[in-house]
């Protein structure tokens, strides 16, 4: 089941992921522009095969504010984060977003340390 979840919990997989880089980004779109912003983000996400060091790119909708869209990104290291910002797809996304936003993105840079994930997340069929 695509994107579905099972309530059966197993022993989670514990991963030490020090050395990676991540970012939590808040995008506040102009009123009524969320569908257009999501289209830009989805188009960009479709190009992530060109970024082998981008390990995770997640788009989140804010349940409390329909004008906020959150991104969570994880990169193998600093070089991968730099390469991410140097791609053609990233440049296009950054060119397409400003007219859709109320202001500049709010970026919180982080250094992940540990991840706990249920094995079922890794084996489910999440294809679109």
Feature roles, as predicted:
Residues 2-21, 59-67, 95-128:
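Glycine-rich beta-strand-turn "strand-cap" elements at beta-sheet edges
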Residues 33-35, 79, 115:
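Residue-level signal for secondary-structure boundary sites
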């Amino acid at each position: 089941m695509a994107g579905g979840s099972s309530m059966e919990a197993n022993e989670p997989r514990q991963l030490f992921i020090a050395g990676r880089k991540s970012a939590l980004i808040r995008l506040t779109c102009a009123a009524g522009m969320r569908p257009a912003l999501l289209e830009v983000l989805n188009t960009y996400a479709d190009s992530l095969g060109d970024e082998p060091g981008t390990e995770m790119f997640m788009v989140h909708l804010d349940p409390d504010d329909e004008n906020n869209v959150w991104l969570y990104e994880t990169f193998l290291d600093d070089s991968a984060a730099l390469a991410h910002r140097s791609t053609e797809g990233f440049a296009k996304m950054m060119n397409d977003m400003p007219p859709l936003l109320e202001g500049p993105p709010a970026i919180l840079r982080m250094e992940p340390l540990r991840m706990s994930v249920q094995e079922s997340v890794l084996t489910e069929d999440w294809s679109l």
